Amino acid sequence: MVSLEMLKEHETVRTAPVSEAEALVDVRGLSLWYGKKQALYDISVRFPRNQVTAIIGPSGCGKSTLLRSLNRMNDLVPGVRVEGEVLYEGVNIYDPRVDPVAVRRHIGMVFQKPNPFPKTIFENVAFGLRLMGVKGSELEDRVVEALKRAALWEEVKDRFKKESGLRLSGGQQQRLCIARAIAVEPPLLLMDEPTSALDPIATQAIEDLILELKERYTVVIVTHNMQQAARVSDRTLFMHLGVLVEEGPTEVIFTKPKHPYTEAYITGRFG
């Protein structure tokens, strides 16, 4: 039986660690509490630019909590307390002088369940751009470009100005949410189990899209699906009980894990 005390006694196992120069995000000594319950324990990890990093681990291990710490979404939960730093392009986003709303403009997020606005497809994608003051032909050009990058344009080009985003299929709605997120050109895109509510065909479309997105963006994805992590990611983090147990290139984590707990999880002995 794996205990928290046993995990905390061991340092994170790191294979081919990411250098400071390679990192878009540098997490240093991050701990987080929901009220009196500690959810993350002294996590330090770097997320490299233009790569996909997957976060895996059993339910309740802190995957989504870590992900939401990267754009301060956890601030919205009453009673949250954070220690440590999250450096985004060298700036600690938890510095009291940093506006969390401004942070979220730079860091896009796609949730487990598609959440399109009750607006037209066009207005869904235009929403963030309008907040930035983009208007006229530039607005339309950027909406179309985002829909193309999200592999949705060909399916909606004849109706995107008049049809509600709520009328799209589940897979299309998720791609619409991705288009909305990338329209404002965020260097970092966070995805919290983006395909868990989708059928296999829609899942394949999103996975193909993730592989394309890393050419322009840095992507961090939380997934319960280990096969998905193996397919789409360059690096993988394995978490358990709020502790970062092991991190490294995805191929290493899945074929030659160094930590016995990682191996036990990968081979299905717990989880």
UniProtKB/Swiss-Prot annotation:
Localization (cell): Cell inner membrane
Family annotation (CDD domains): ABC_PstB_phosphate_transporter
Keyword hit for Acetylation: no
Protein name according to UniProt: Phosphate import ATP-binding protein PstB
Binding site for ATP: G57, P58, S59, G60, C61, G62, K63, S64
Coarse class of the protein's main subcellular location: membrane
GO molecular function, one term: ATPase-coupled phosphate ion transmembrane transporter activity
SMART domains assigned to the protein according to its UniProt record, in alphabetical order: AAA
Reaction equations catalysed: phosphate(out) + ATP + H2O = ADP + 2 phosphate(in) + H(+)
Annotated coiled-coil segments of the chain: none
GO biological process, one term: phosphate ion transmembrane transport
Keyword Membrane belongs to the record: yes
InterPro entries assigned: AAA+_ATPase, ABC_transporter-like_ATP-bd, ABC_transporter-like_CS, P-loop_NTPase, PstB-like
GO cellular component: plasma membrane
Chain's role: Part of the ABC transporter complex PstSACB involved in phosphate import. Responsible for energy coupling to the transport system.
Keywords recorded for this protein, A-Z: ATP-binding, Cell inner membrane, Cell membrane, Membrane, Nucleotide-binding, Phosphate transport, Translocase, Transport
Enzyme Commission number(s) from the entry: 7.3.2.1
Subunit structure, interactors included: The complex is composed of two ATP-binding proteins (PstB), two transmembrane proteins (PstC and PstA) and a solute-binding protein (PstS).
Record organism: Thermus thermophilus (strain ATCC 27634 / DSM 579 / HB8)
Boundaries of every ABC transporter domain copy: 13-266
Family, per entry: Belongs to the ABC transporter superfamily. Phosphate importer (TC 3.A.1.7) family.
UniProt membrane topology term: Peripheral membrane protein
